[in-house]
Amino acid sequence: ENVMEPSPDSLVAIARGIDDPRFGLCLDIGHANTVVIQTPPLDWLEPMRPYLRHVHLHDNHGHLDEHLPLGDGSMPIPALLDALSALPDVTITLENQSVAPSLQYLSAHGYL
C-alpha cells in the first residue's frame, strides 16, 4: 500500500522486481491525494495497473488523510470511479469513518 510516496514508481519497481503473480499492490487513493503536488491520484492508476489488486477509496482535501465520505473532499471521485470500472478484477474497500454517506453518494451518481 502506498503511504506517502510522491509517485507510484517505487511500488511499481518493487512489484516488477518480485515478478510473482501472487504479489500485488494496494492503492490508497486518499494517500495518493495527500501528495497531489507530485502525482495526482488518477496518474497512479496506469503505472500500477498490471500489479493492482486492491484500492482503498475515501475522500480528502489534499492535505490530511481525512478519510472523508466520497464527495466531501476535493478529489475527482467520478473520474476515479470511471477509471476503476475498467479494472474489474480490482477490489475496492470504502475507508470512510462513516460508510453510509459514501453509499448514498455512489447510489446518487449511478454507481450502485
Model-based region annotation:
Residues P8-L112:
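Histidine-acidic metal/acid-base catalytic patches
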Residues N2-V3, S10:
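Conserved anion-binding
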Residues E1-N2, S107:
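Catalytic cores of phosphodiester-bond-cleaving enzymes
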